[in-house]
Amino acid sequence: MPSKNSINRPKQKLNLQHRVQKNAAKRSARERAGLLAPPRSSDQSQSGRAKSIPLDLFRGERVDQGPITTKTLSKKRAKKIERNLRYVEQRKLLVDVQAARESGMDIDVETAVSTKAKTQQTGPLQKVKESIWSALEDVAAQEMIVQTGAGTTLGGQFFP
C-alpha cells in the first residue's frame, strides 16, 4: 500500500477509519483500566493525577484485581517511600511555621497609635530635635558621589 504522502495515496476514508479504530482501542483500554468510570470533572477521577504503583502498594491499595499479581514492593523502595513521606510532612510543618511568622510580623495598629500619641504630648523642643535628626538621617541616606578618573580606567588623561 502506498504511503500517506505518495502521489497515488489511498483515499481519505481509509485513513479516517484507521484513526477511528486507534482511538476506539485507546478509549476501551482506558475504560478497562478504570480511568473513564467517573467523569473527569468529579473528585474521584484519576485523570491527570500521577500514577505510582509502588506508592499504591505501600499504602495497601490494590493495584490488580486478580488473585495473582506481578507487582511487588522491595524493601529498599519501601524505605525510600517512607523517607519521602517524612520529608513531605516536614515540608508541610515548615510552611506552617513560616506562615505563622508572616502573620506574626503584622504591625499592631494600637502600638502605632500609642507612639503617635507620645509624640503629640511632647513639647516644641522635642519636635525641633526630631526634625533635626530626621534631616541628618536624610542627608546620610543620600548617595555619596565619588570623583573618578578623567575618562580612563586608570585615571590618566584622555585625548579624544
UniProtKB/Swiss-Prot annotation:
InterPro entries: Ribosome_bgen_Alb1. GO terms for cellular component: cytoplasm; nucleus. Keywords: Cytoplasm, Nucleus, Ribosome biogenesis, Transport. GO terms for biological process: ribosomal large subunit biogenesis. Its main location: cytoplasm. Disulfide bonds: none annotated. Belongs to the ALB1 family. Involved in proper assembly of pre-ribosomal particles during the biogenesis of the 60S ribosomal subunit. Accompanies the pre-60S particles to the cytoplasm. Component of the nucleoplasmic and cytoplasmic pre-60S ribosomal particles. This is Ribosome biogenesis protein ALB1. It comes from Eremothecium gossypii (strain ATCC 10895 / CBS 109.51 / FGSC 9923 / NRRL Y-1056) (Yeast).
